[in-house]
Amino acid sequence: MKNKYLKSLFAFLLFLNISICSNATVMPRSMGGEDRIKIINYVPNAVFRYIGHYYYQTIIEFSLDEEIQTITMGTPTPWQIVPAGNRIFLKPIEDDATTNMTVITNKRMYFFEMHAKNADSINDPDLAFIIKFVYPSETKDRKSVV
């Protein structure tokens, strides 16, 4: 009886964990050494949270073999957006810049939750000069070749 209870509890906790993780917003993190250079793990069907800073531009860089095909935004007016190959240059230019953005490349689809705020200074650790996507499957493929 105790075994059955533990199995049920384990199954419930596993389900709860999967539900929470699948609805989590993914945030960029610093690579180490330079806080303004950030990476973000690509997770299919995740929403990536981006915080832009007024008066500063950021590059979002996708895989080298990706090319941007379409960018759409809920409210594009507050943002300056310049696509270039596998990169997007982003800069908030108006107040109330909260919106969403979808990027479709030749390989993947990305969903972004967009926000903007003022930076404390050019050395603000929340400021991102570049955000590079990292793809776990590509990392595994490279390791298996070595």
Regions found by a protein language model. Give the residues of each.
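Bacterial N-terminal signal peptides
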Residues: 10-19
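Bacterial N-terminal signal peptides that target proteins for export
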Residues: 1-10
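A general "mature secreted/periplasmic domain" signal
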Residues: 22-146
